[in-house]
Amino acid sequence: MSIMRRRILIVCAAACAGVGALAHAQAQPQQPVSALKGHNSNAPVDVTADRIEVQDRADRAMFAGNVHVTQAELTLDTERLTVAYSSAGSIQIDRLDASGGVVVTSPSETARGDFGVYDLNRKLITLVGNVRLTRGDSNIIGSRLVIDLNSGRAVIAGGPAGVAQSGGRVKGHFTVPNRGD
């Protein structure tokens, strides 16, 4: 086989492989990405509440009553919030602990739970107790939710049997788009 003919066969094989790979990639369903993926946990945090108590020696502030937190496109609403911070130089918020009807909202999702922790250093939001994650008309119910703000990945666990309404299992309801059948 001549060198020229061998090169033509290699180019044709590569072209066919490329077309096959493209067709396979287009056939794969696109996974929805959370609006919280890549959330800037270094953005300023704004907190409003009915009452605040600052415990400077303990490097924490406690907010109570209609607490509303915003950071970029993320909002958190709750009844009570403890803000842990470090005060070496300037104040840097490390963690938010929320209790009492915690609701975390992004442009496309809403997550609810009894208690919540937002670890700004690890870029994780954890909700526990009667957890519900809603996106559009779809929702998932469980006992614990962890949202990784780096990847946008959300993991929901069911918890021990008999503890949660879902009987220890995760329960989901997903809407299906009309396919014009």
Language-model segments: what does each one mean?
Residues M1-D181:
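Mature-chain termini and adjacent capping regions
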